[in-house]
Amino acid sequence: MILLVQLMLGVALAASAGLRAWLPLFVVGLLARTGQIDLNASFDFLSRTDALIVFGVATVLEFLGDKIVVVDHFLDSLGTFIRPVAGTLLASSMLTVTEPVTATVVGIVTGGGTALTVHAGKMLTRIKATAALPLHGGTANAALSLSEDFVVGTWLWIAMVSPWVAFLLALVALAVAVWLIMALWRSGKHLLAVLTGARKNEPRSIDLK
């Protein structure tokens, strides 16, 4: 039962990392530093002073940068590599009753995969918001960013209070992200088919020379 709860908590934290890479790491590191939670011994470095300073500064920079047009898209692109790593660290560090190697492998599969999927859904939401409101894309993205800040903060609190509920929220986030990815894939295939068909139907010029 303990392992199941730790797995669910790890997935929930990883899902939140799909929206914000650094805040979950900072919160988990701080809670571990103050003795509120335990980490897998191999991941105790998350609660070191230097790690907390890096996580704290990065959290502030991510919070501010995500509200600025162009910078937010750059951070999302960078997050494609950072957030899965953050998700892996969070999920692995929660598995205190398993060996470090096992915890790392499980963390990569559950945490890294979850964070990457949620991150992809977030990126697609931002793209759709910019495309739907080209003149107000920056405002729309800033509003979405603030809502994500609220969601992640609330999510982290719920995860510490009730891992079961946080895990269910993670499943919902994963379902929405997968739906967005599939919707974009279908629309992309449809657009490609339309463009290909249009080119095939283009009248060819006849050379009379």
Briefly describe each language-model feature range.
Residues H73-V85, I108:
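Cytoplasmic-side transmembrane-helix entry/capping segments in multi-pass membrane proteins
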Residues A12, L89-M94, K122-T130, S145, ...:
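Generic transmembrane alpha-helix signature in multi-pass membrane proteins
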Residues V105-V109, A129-L144:
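The feature identifies polytopic integral membrane transport proteins across all domains of life
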Residues V60-H73, L124-A132:
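C-terminal ends of transmembrane helices
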Residues T80-S92, G138-T154, K200-L208:
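Small-residue-rich segments of transmembrane alpha-helices in multi-pass membrane proteins
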Residues M1-V5, L31-T49, A91-G107, A159-F167:
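Helix-coil boundary and interhelical linker segments in multi-pass alpha-helical membrane proteins
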Residues V85-T96, A103-T125, F150:
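Mid-bilayer segments of alpha-helical transmembrane spans in multi-pass integral membrane proteins
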Residues F55-G65, G111-K122, W179-M182:
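Alpha-helical transmembrane segments of multi-pass membrane proteins
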